């Protein structure tokens, strides 16, 4: 092991400074750049050299990643002691005007002389790879959500529409052998009733799949129409509150909010055993929040979900497609609260 005070270690550190792909900049206690290696000259040009470090860096900085945004100048890392105590991601403009992401440090290395070191490591390839992996995950989630939707539609077609159509088919076949005119008319009226119900079922299914009002008028109108139909069909009252009025959001976000709320309501209908369900939609700052609350049976979150379990799984899958999250608070006998939170 090389002695920390040895000339050999100093030589190695000098070689690292001169030949490293890591960009290294030193500034004195007045903020003036006193040295930078060749790698740093991709960022700080000769005209920036020996100027105030804040001016030189700010001239090239496009923001760093913090709690507020991916690229922000709020609580600048040059001034924040909390940021300086950690590695952070910063976006810098190179001399050829390309904005590149870097892992950076900005720390005091010589307290007596007030010398700071600013280091940058290019992470473009890592971020590009992460984005590819993220896109692949999102694609898998999208396909999974589509498959779950197809399964749901298949079940509904089999359990309602196809069964009714088979019933009509049987009754139509029997009409051929019916000689009693009065009974024939009675059977015909019954078939008319079944066909009318079948039309309603298909219309309702069409609305559930993609209501025209969602595309044309937005969430507020789509929900009011859906809740009215829901109350008529199932006799369960929906207490709806909202502050979004006629505000429109990205189409993908509106679809996710509509689907998650719809799924949460249907789950409450199937398992909660309640006469009313509370639904709230609100925009708070840079987030869109949807809540579905019932005071019904509740369930044990650690137990296996009732039914297929695709409902709860599908809600999370959908939310992740728009960088959102679903939180479910429930307890047996105390109801369920489903909260969807989406950044906008």
UniProtKB/Swiss-Prot annotation:
Annotated compartments: Cytoplasm
GO molecular function terms listed in the Swiss-Prot or TrEMBL record: 4 iron, 4 sulfur cluster binding; ATP binding; iron ion binding; phosphorelay sensor kinase activity; protein dimerization activity
Phosphohistidine found at: 158
SMART domains: HATPase_c
Co-factor requirement: [4Fe-4S] cluster
Catalytic reaction list: ATP + protein L-histidine = ADP + protein N-phospho-L-histidine
Superkingdom to which the source organism belongs: Bacteria
Maturation and modification: Autophosphorylated.
Principal location class: cytoplasm
Keyword vocabulary terms for this entry: 4Fe-4S, ATP-binding, Cytoplasm, Iron, Iron-sulfur, Kinase, Metal-binding, Nucleotide-binding, Phosphoprotein, Transferase, Two-component regulatory system
Transmembrane segments: none
Span of domain Histidine kinase: 152-344
EC number: 2.7.13.3
Cofactor: record remark: Binds 1 [4Fe-4S] cluster.
InterPro entries: HATPase_C_sf, His_kinase_dom, Sensor_HK_TwoCompSys, Sig_transdc_His_kin-like_C, Sig_transdc_His_kin_sub3_dim/P, Sig_transdc_His_kinase_NreB
Keyword Calcium assigned: no
Name of the protein in its database record: Oxygen sensor histidine kinase NreB
Organism of this sequence: Staphylococcus aureus (strain MRSA252)
Name of the gene: nreB
């Amino acid at each position: 092991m090389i002695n920390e005070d040895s000339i050999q270690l100093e030589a190695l550190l000098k070689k690292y400074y001169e030949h490293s792909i890591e960009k290294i900049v030193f500034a004195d206690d007045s903020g003036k750049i006193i040295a930078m290696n060749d790698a740093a000259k991709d960022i700080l040009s000769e005209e920036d050299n020996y100027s105030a470090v804040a001016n030189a860096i700010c001239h090239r900085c496009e923001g760093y990643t913090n709690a507020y945004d991916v690229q922000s100048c709020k609580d600048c890392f040059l001034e924040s002691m909390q940021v300086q105590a950690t590695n952070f991601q910063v976006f810098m403009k190179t001399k050829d005007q390309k904005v590149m992401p870097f892992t950076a440090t900005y720390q005091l290395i010589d307290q007596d002389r007030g010398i700071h070191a600013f280091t940058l490591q290019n992470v473009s390839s890592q971020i590009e790879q992460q984005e590819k992996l993220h896109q692949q995950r999102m694609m898998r989630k999208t396909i999974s959500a589509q498959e779950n939707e197809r399964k749901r539609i298949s079940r509904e077609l089999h359990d309602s529409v196809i069964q009714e159509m088979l019933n009509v088919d049987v009754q139509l076949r029997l009409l051929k052998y019916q000689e009693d005119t009065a009974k024939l008319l009675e059977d015909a009226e019954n078939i008319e009733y079944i066909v009318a119900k079948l039309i309603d079922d298909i219309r309702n299914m069409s609305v559930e799949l993609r209501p025209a009002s969602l595309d044309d008028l937005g969430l507020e109108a789509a929900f009011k129409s859906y809740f009215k139909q829901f109350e008529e069909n199932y006799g369960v009252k929906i207490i709806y509150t909202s502050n979004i009025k006629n505000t429109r959001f990205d189409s993908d976000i509106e679809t996710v909010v509509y689907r998650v709320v719809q799924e949460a309501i249907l789950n409450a209908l199937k398992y909660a055993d309640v006469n009313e369900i509370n639904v709230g939609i609100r925009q708070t700052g840079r987030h869109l929040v949807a809540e579905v609350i019932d005071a019904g049976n509740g369930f044990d979150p650690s137990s296996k979900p009732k039914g297929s379990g695709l409902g709860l799984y599908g809600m999370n899958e959908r939310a992740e497609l728009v960088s959102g999250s679903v939180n479910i608070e429930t307890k047996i006998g105390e109801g369920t609260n489903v909260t969807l939170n989406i950044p906008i």
